Regions:
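Canonical tetratricopeptide repeat
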Residues: 2, 36, 70-73
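Conserved structural position within tetratricopeptide repeats
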Residues: 24-25, 59
Length: 91
């Protein structure tokens, strides 16, 4: 994931997404790749994939300290994408 973070900081979002997706594929119960995927997709202005990744992050790690912040990001992205915001309860 460190290589993915490097690519993200350099603005090479496609390479970063490849690395984070690979980490998520091999360790699907690890939360961090899903969060980083969401952030990278968001930087790439890919709202649908960002939302999907953030939701997976919350599914894998529902007790995350930043859960409320991530839920707010999801709602904001859904609003911008013209979707009905999710009705997820706050843990």
């Amino acid at each position: 994931m460190e290589i993915g973070t490097f690519y993200m900081k350099k603005g090479n979002y496609d390479a970063a997404i490849d690395r984070f997706a690979e980490a998520a594929r091999y360790q699907p119960t690890l939360a961090r790749p899903w969060l980083l995927l969401g952030e990278t997709y968001e930087k790439k202005h890919d709202k649908a994939h960002a939302i999907e990744s953030y939701k997976k992050y919350l599914e894998v790690f529902p007790g995350a300290e930043d859960a409320a912040k991530v839920q707010k990001r999801i709602a904001t992205l859904e609003e911008k994408a013209g979707q009905q915001p999710s009705k997820r309860p706050t843990p």
